[in-house]
Design a protein with these regions (language model features):
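Enrichment for repetitive, rod-forming helical segments
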Residues: 9-10, 171, 351
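Bacterial N-terminal signal peptides
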Residues: 8-16
Length: 382
């Protein structure tokens, strides 16, 4: 009895230490801060706190003072316009001193800070900065929704090539959340076309929800609206497109690749280009004589095309996933697509049924034989 009582007392004495070891989530102190705009700036504090990427502040710098008892330990910025390196200066002993910096040029950027009460956000180049959304955090653990993107490292298991932001969810459905978070595959998401800053912010929000933590590869080709493969190549140049796509394979070295329908789903020219260029890039990427400046040759193992009618497999996005607390891959893809607020008026929805069902793919190329079970992109790949 005495031993049991002693054990209980020891447990009770240790409980405060256990709870102290679990860091509390940092509080959002943005609303309690004072903002001082740079001369000749445009936009207001409210434009950076209205949950819209279409309104923003632009200026040479942005100065912020936090409450006396709440210094800033973390800064989360969602940029408008073209991303650029920036730094955070702290007011110290009567002068501005650099406290932290970020040269990665990410559209959504989190920067840990050492507990600052007066700070300035300054572009590292002789330029202005444009901020669509800002969050200042107090001491504690970063909230999960705050995106702390990491640079890509290593070799990919799966490369997803999407023509535009949101196509990766509309037409590939649960591929990204299922293989990234549930199956723990190393997934790189690449885009063909360049996007507006708003759409870059939205695509990052969606990918973060899907469990992606390494920054995606943003596209480089100006978006155009047409339904012709030839016209799209004519606008961008087939050679630059093939070099870009081949370069993706050599840089990320994926085993499996997923991209668009050869017919462009509903006929979009950029979707057609993704499929056509990837098909042509397979041999080019493996050929050491083809543009050796793009990196070491690489042979992919499989290429899946959306809706391809041969060697078809239908993936089940409706199974509960432990990685998402019981949500399905379909649930996650749908929630991620909802992040693309600028595209809600186009009438498209995430669907695993109908003529554009996002769970139907065909094995266009394989270096490891045909699928037998037909329920996994990585069948026959160790």
């Amino acid at each position: 009895m005495k031993k049991a009582l002693l054990l209980m007392i020891l447990v009770l004495l240790c409980l405060p230490l256990v709870f102290a070891a679990v860091a509390e989530e940092a509080q959002d102190i943005t609303g309690r801060c004072e903002f001082i705009a740079a001369p000749a700036s445009q936009g207001r504090k409210a434009d950076m706190q209205d949950h819209s990427y279409l309104t923003y502040y632009t200026g040479k710098y942005l100065e912020i003072s936090t409450p006396e008892n709440a210094p800033c330990f973390g800064l989360y910025l969602c940029f408008a316009g073209r991303e650029a390196p920036y730094r955070v200066d702290a007011w110290q002993d009567g002068a501005w001193v650099t406290a932290a910096s970020d040269a990665r040029q990410y559209a959504n950027s989190f920067l840990p800070l050492p507990g600052i009460r007066r700070l300035r956000v300054v572009p590292d180049r002789n330029d202005t900065l444009s901020i669509a959304e800002i969050t200042l955090l107090g001491e504690g653990e970063k909230p999960e929704w705050v995106q702390d993107w990491k640079p890509w490292q290593g070799k990919a298991d799966l490369l997803v090539l999407s023509a535009h932001a949101d196509d990766e969810l509309l037409f590939f459905g649960g591929v990204i959340p299922y293989y990234t978070a549930q199956m723990q595959k190393h997934v790189i998401v690449c885009y063909l076309t360049d996007q507006t800053s708003c759409r870059r912010n939205e695509l990052l929000d969606g990918l973060w929800l899907c469990g992606v933590r390494e920054y995606p590869r943003m596209g480089v080709f100006k978006d155009i609206k047409n339904n012709s493969l030839g016209d799209s190549y004519g606008f961008w140049g087939e050679k630059p497109v093939l070099e870009y796509v081949t370069g993706l394979l050599r840089e990320y070295r994926p085993d499996v690749v997923v991209t668009h329908d050869k017919g462009g789903e509903y006929g979009h020219g950029a979707h057609r280009v993704c499929a056509d260029a990837m098909i042509k890039a397979i041999d080019r990427a493996a050929d050491g004589a083809y543009l050796p400046n793009l990196g070491e040759p690489w042979q992919i193992q499989k290429l899946y095309l959306h809706l391809y009618k041969q060697n078809t497999l239908t993936l089940d996005w409706r199974q509960p996933l432990s990685a998402f607390g019981g949500q399905t891959a379909f649930d996650v893809a749908k929630a991620a697509f909802d992040c693309h607020a600028s595209q809600r008026s186009n009438g498209l929805i995430v669907q695993d049924w109908g003529p554009h069902a996002n769970n139907v793919f065909g094995l266009y190329y394989s270096n490891v034989g045909l699928d037998e079970q037909g329920d996994d992109l990585f069948e026959h790949i160790p």
